Amino acid sequence: EMQRSLVGSEMCIRDSSQTVPVTVTAFDPEANLALLRLKNEADAAFLDKLVPVTLGNAPRLGDKVTFWQFNDDGLPITTSGTLLATESSSPFTNSEPFVLYNVKSSVTPLKGGAGNPIMRDNKLVALSASCDPSAQKALAVTHTMISRFLQQARSGNYTGFPADGTQVTELTDPVFRKFLGLPETGGGFYVVKLPVYGSFYKAGVRPGDVVESVNGIPLDSKGLIRDPALGPVSANVLFRDSAMPGDIITLGIRRKGKDGVSQPMTLDVKLDRSALEGDLVNPSPFIANP
């Protein structure tokens, strides 16, 4: 358990009064993830009292998982659950949503409900984000997000997840598709508006464009991709959850011409966080290394 104060950050064991100072090497308030290290080498023995866990394989729909919690005496409390689907949500800050796991479980959070490990075969596969025991529903930070966070955090230069700020709508209405000059069948999402300082706009995407694919992966008419392990998933996972600032993605788009015909084209987008950094009020002002 980590405790923060004006003096600094400390880590303690639930069933012990011992605390040690730690340094926060990377912190992401959007994803509620942090990477810590001991501040003093002399406290290395403190870690011997902890049980390490490893990051397991990414779960699939239908997999059984276990929520781990610990009471004030350090005793474990476990609750089972089943991964049912994914859901786009931003539970920690008022920023762009992530793709989170939707887990059916009656887990009742002891403190806050966020940050508790979710295990499968005694390996970490997710972290709790929010719990609703009455609905038997829990949202969880995904394996993809944890892996991506650790990969960048270990590099020593953590900058956060890409954010573009583009607002889109689905293309399920056949009348709307006809108005846009699109084929009767097909997929994609319609770009309603986007910030001029965002990565999509800087790459040439404009309001009225239809994004049909990302890196060659087709989107359905709701703007979803078909993930082999998770089923229908928001395309955001390709340019936010699993990506890093500086990554380049290729968008397959259609743009309606003056003749009313929608023409296909491709655009390469260099992902960044300029949509947040350009806002007058930044919802996540402390995304960089503390």
List each model region and its residues:
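Single conserved hydrophobic/aromatic residue that forms the stacking wall/gate
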Residues: 1-8, 12-13
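Conserved catalytic-core segment of clan PA serine endopeptidases
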Residues: 10, 14-42, 70, 240, ...
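Active-site region of chymotrypsin-like
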Residues: 39-51, 76-140, 184-192
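C-terminal, low-ordered peptide segments at domain boundaries
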Residues: 42-46, 51-55, 61, 222-223, ...
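PDZ domains, with a preference for the canonical peptide-binding region formed by the helix
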Residues: 143, 202, 213-252
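PDZ/PDZ-like peptide-tail recognition elements
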Residues: 148-190, 272-290
